[in-house]
């Protein structure tokens, strides 16, 4: 288990996110939720101004910026580190101008025209792999070993980013989960069990985002609001496997579970 594990607390400023759409669309509600997640153990707040679920309507960058602007200002005043979850360069550029600590792109930063601006910034970049371009979709995983597919994606994307002057030590790898890997839950389970291969191959930190994902709902038969136990089990598996970052809707149970894992490890060490 990684002792320096960083927890991203998710705040969806959306009307149609699969698990909490509309709850935090108002700025005051989003700010209050961010502060709550920090009090419950999050290290960073990950603001998502558009849903990535397969049935979500597209959101313009202007709308994304309008949603995040007052929340960013309030969290910055609080000294809270912020990650922006958006794949739109205009939204990313605005967030960089407001001093976000991370950009989290579900498309993995494909727009080479934006690389010079990324290179001038200091934010860390969460580069996510997906079997499709953009929001999640209900499609099958590619043929062959999924880890080979993911590794090939990162080989190409890391080369493109670093070739444009973006320092390698700013990159964080996210293999994707749920519909981002395909409709079958077995694909996500395979990646969850083997993501350490990415850490070994690329010598870069890895972020896992399994919270309330479709593969957990498929495995348990539960709805989005009733997979807390399944989420925690998957997150603790990620932590035990050496994840550097975990992105979650619920930091408190994760922190509690991590404390138990750490205590068990220490007990085993001194026996």
From Swiss-Prot:
Give the binding site residues for 7,8-dihydropteroate: 52, 85, 104, 174, 179, 213-214
Q: Which family does it belong to?
A: Belongs to the DHPS family.
According to the record's subunit comment, the protein's assembly and interactions are:
Homodimer.
Which controlled-vocabulary keywords does the entry list? Antibiotic resistance, Folate biosynthesis, Magnesium, Metal-binding, Plasmid, Transferase
Signal peptide span: none
Q: List its EC numbers.
A: 2.5.1.15
Provide the Pterin-binding domain boundaries: 1-259
Positions annotated to bind (7,8-dihydropterin-6-yl)methyl diphosphate: 85, 104, 174, 213, 247-249
| Extra facts | The sulII gene is located on various IncQ (Broad-host-range) plasmids and other small non-conjugative resistance plasmids.
List GO terms (cellular component aspect). cytosol
Give me the residues that bind diphosphate, please: 12, 18, 51-52, 247, 249
Recite the lineage of the species: Bacteria, Pseudomonadati, Pseudomonadota, Gammaproteobacteria, Enterobacterales
Write out the GO MF terms.
Answer: dihydropteroate synthase activity; metal ion binding
CDD domains recorded: DHPS (cd00739)
The prosthetic group or cofactor this protein requires is:
Mg(2+)
Please report a single Pfam family linked to this protein. Answer: Pterin_bind
> Pathway of this protein?
Cofactor biosynthesis; tetrahydrofolate biosynthesis; 7,8-dihydrofolate from 2-amino-4-hydroxy-6-hydroxymethyl-7,8-dihydropteridine diphosphate and 4-aminobenzoate: step 1/2
- For the ligand (Mg(2+)), the binding residues are 12
Q: Where does 4-aminobenzoate bind?
A: 12, 247
Which Gene3D superfamilies does this entry report, sorted A to Z?
Dihydropteroate synthase-like (3.20.20.20)
* Task of the protein: Catalyzes the condensation of para-aminobenzoate (pABA) with 6-hydroxymethyl-7,8-dihydropterin diphosphate (DHPt-PP) to form 7,8-dihydropteroate (H2Pte), the immediate precursor of folate derivatives. Confers resistance to sulfonamide antibiotics, including sulfamethoxazole (SMX), sulfadiazine and sulfisoxazole. The type II enzyme is stable whereas type I DHPS loses its activity rapidly.
What reactions does this protein catalyze?
(7,8-dihydropterin-6-yl)methyl diphosphate + 4-aminobenzoate = 7,8-dihydropteroate + diphosphate
Q: Name one GO biological process term.
A: folic acid biosynthetic process
Please give the name of this protein. Dihydropteroate synthase type-2
Q: Which residues bind 6-hydroxymethyl-7,8-dihydropterin?
A: 104, 174, 213
